[in-house]
């Protein structure tokens, strides 16, 4: 097994920190994150629900939760769902930890990961997730950088491996080229079916969608969000 080193070190901060953290945020990074962070150096449990303190009925993954607006909203809506949140940027992780310090009950059905989501996807057991959310990922708008986009054949294979049959992959973006890119890859993948009846469905937010600061900015700049859902066959 490849050893995964903790990311809370000088390299992590130099690469992934934006604004300077407040003292209480630094404290949570040092004390609460090690408790909730998934250690990939340990074998994945055969029953992934054992990761959580609370008894959970299903498990969902959010990749790149940013400031945590959507993930916090979903945790409050679904207290019997276990959530795994991935965010490699320290400022977003710090905001999430501040929320968890205030709403301590959610610590019992949330686990975190602060590095590359592909490492976590490779660690997870087969068919262990009920859903995966990827909202407003970095679009890498320059064509020469499109190969860096998170949606690619290898990652779709990863999603297919860890999702249960009938599990949902949800994707939102305000960048047309990334929406088209995502549709192309998913509709050409043997393991996924696009859940849409009419083009109008693309523009309808998910039920009780809380929106995010990034989405609000996109709307102010006249970029129209698109919401896609794909089902694991």
From Swiss-Prot:
Molecular function GO labels: tRNA (guanine(46)-N7)-methyltransferase activity
Family, as annotated: Belongs to the class I-like SAM-binding methyltransferase superfamily. TrmB family.
Keywords: Methyltransferase, S-adenosyl-L-methionine, Transferase, tRNA processing
Active site: 138
EC number(s) reported in the record: 2.1.1.33
Organismal lineage: Bacteria, Pseudomonadati, Pseudomonadota, Alphaproteobacteria, Hyphomicrobiales
Chain positions recorded as substrate binding sites: 142, 174, 212-215
SUPFAM superfamilies cross-referenced by the UniProt entry: S-adenosyl-L-methionine-dependent methyltransferases
GO cellular component terms attached to this protein's record: tRNA methyltransferase complex
The protein, known as: tRNA (guanine-N(7)-)-methyltransferase
Pathway: tRNA modification; N(7)-methylguanine-tRNA biosynthesis
Its job: Catalyzes the formation of N(7)-methylguanine at position 46 (m7G46) in tRNA.
Pfam family, one: Methyltransf_4
Catalysed reactions listed for this entry: guanosine(46) in tRNA + S-adenosyl-L-methionine = N(7)-methylguanosine(46) in tRNA + S-adenosyl-L-homocysteine
């Amino acid at each position: 097994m490849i050893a995964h080193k903790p990311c809370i070190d000088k390299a992590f901060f130099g690469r992934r920190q934006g604004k300077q953290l407040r003292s209480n945020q630094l404290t949570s990074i040092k004390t609460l994150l090690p408790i909730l962070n998934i250690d990939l150096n340990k074998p994945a449990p055969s029953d992934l629900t054992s990761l959580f303190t609370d008894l959970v009925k299903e498990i969902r993954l959010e990749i790149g939760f940013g400031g945590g607006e959507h993930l916090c909203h979903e945790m409050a809506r679904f207290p019997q769902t276990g959530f795994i949140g991935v965010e490699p940027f320290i400022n977003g992780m710090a905001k999430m930890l501040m929320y968890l310090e205030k709403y301590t009950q959610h610590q019992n059905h949330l686990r975190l990961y602060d590095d590359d989501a592909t490492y976590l996807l490779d660690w997870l057991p087969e068919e262990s997730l009920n859903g995966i959310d990827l909202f407003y990922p970095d679009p890498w708008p320059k064509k020469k950088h499109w190969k860096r986009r998170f949606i690619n054949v290898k990652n779709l294979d990863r999603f297919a491996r860890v999702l249960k049959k009938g599990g949902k992959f949800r994707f939102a973006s305000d960048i047309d080229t990334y929406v088209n890119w995502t549709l192309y890859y998913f509709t050409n993948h043997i393991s996924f079916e696009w859940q849409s009846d009419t083009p109008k469905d693309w523009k309808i937010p998910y039920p009780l969608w809380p929106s995010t600061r990034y989405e609000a900015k996109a709307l102010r700049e006249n970029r129209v969000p698109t919401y896609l859902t794909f089902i694991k066959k």
